[in-house]
């Protein structure tokens, strides 16, 4: 697993999570040293079943464009190197640097923080372009990010397609990593029922309310039809992860309900790796 992205976006949290899950981790490794590093680890483990996670970013001052060539060569030898790219909005990164008072790695070039962030986006663009998954952490805290890594990536089997059903609030932005986005704001809102307002889409009261609504029944059936038609096509693609996101006003009732309902349907259809993530609740 190759972990890359913008400074302050959560790469260190991701690597620590992989380490806790028994990955052998190395951070800030120059791209040109990656082949020797992998070979040395495999020689020390003849069975070849050791899980590795490597952090690569602008701190190494490497030619990041070399990574694509190495991944292609590694694949020819039966080594799958998946690339996760972490990013966040400028606003989120600026706030995190203000809170931690850390220096940006590119500040040594004499750049102000906003300029350093912009320059880093340019330098890491080749990595972002070839990423297997892009994770926007702007709206995530440390605990949410850790849970996200565990549920969507760390427990996955590399030869199977992992599905993540995510709920979110539109007022906090659409998840940048979403492959499919469905707007649940067209559905009746349990928020206006005083008894249902404090509940979430995971509670029986909200489920019972929405299960009876004709628009919900029709909308859910149309989503099921679309996903049942197209998700199997992606199984034969080179991608390892698919994120299906559902949004509503507050990310509490309708979006959570749909994410849970579709995840349940996916499991019933035999998909082996299905996870849910409720951005505004978890």
Swiss-Prot record:
The keyword Iron does not apply. InterPro entries: P-loop_NTPase (IPR027417), RapZ-like (IPR005337), RapZ-like_N (IPR053930), RapZ_C (IPR053931). ATP binds at residues 5-12. Keywords: ATP-binding, GTP-binding, Nucleotide-binding. Pfam families: PapZ_C, RapZ-like_N. Coiled coil: none annotated. One of its GO terms (molecular function) is ATP binding. It comes from the Bacteria. Belongs to the RapZ-like family. This is Nucleotide-binding protein XCC2806. It comes from Xanthomonas campestris pv. campestris (strain ATCC 33913 / DSM 3586 / NCPPB 528 / LMG 568 / P 25).
């Amino acid at each position: 697993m190759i972990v890359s992205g913008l400074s302050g976006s959560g790469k260190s949290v991701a690597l620590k999570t992989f380490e806790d899950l028994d990955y052998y981790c190395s951070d800030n490794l120059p791209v040109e040293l990656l082949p020797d590093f992998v070979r040395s680890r495999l020689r020390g483990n003849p069975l070849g079943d050791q899980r590795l996670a490597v952090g690569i970013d602008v701190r190494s001052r490497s030619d990041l464009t070399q990574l694509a060539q190495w991944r292609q060569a590694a694949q020819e030898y039966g080594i799958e190197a998946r690339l996760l790219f972490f990013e966040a909005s400028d606003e989120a990164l600026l706030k995190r640097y203000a809170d931690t008072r850390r220096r940006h790695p590119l500040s040594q070039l004499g750049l102000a923080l906003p300029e350093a962030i912009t320059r880093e986006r340019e330098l890491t663009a080749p990595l972002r372009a070839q990423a297997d998954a892009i994770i926007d952490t702007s709206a995530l805290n440390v605990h949410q990010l850790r849970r996200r890594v565990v549920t969507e990536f760390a427990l996955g089997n590399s030869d199977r397609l992992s599905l993540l059903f995510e709920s979110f609030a539109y007022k906090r932005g659409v998840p940048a990593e979403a492959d499919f986005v469905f707007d649940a704001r067209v559905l009746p809102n349990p928020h206006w029922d005083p008894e249902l307002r404090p509940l979430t889409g995971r509670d029986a009261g909200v489920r019972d309310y929405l299960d009876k609504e004709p628009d919900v029944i029709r909308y859910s059936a149309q989503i099921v039809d679309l996903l049942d038609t197209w998700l199997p096509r992606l199984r034969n693609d080179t991608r390892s992860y698919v994120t299906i996101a559902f949004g509503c006003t507050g990310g509490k009732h309708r979006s959570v309900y749909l994410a849970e309902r579709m995840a349940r349907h996916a499991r019933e259809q035999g998909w082996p790796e299905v996870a849910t993530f409720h951005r505004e609740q978890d």
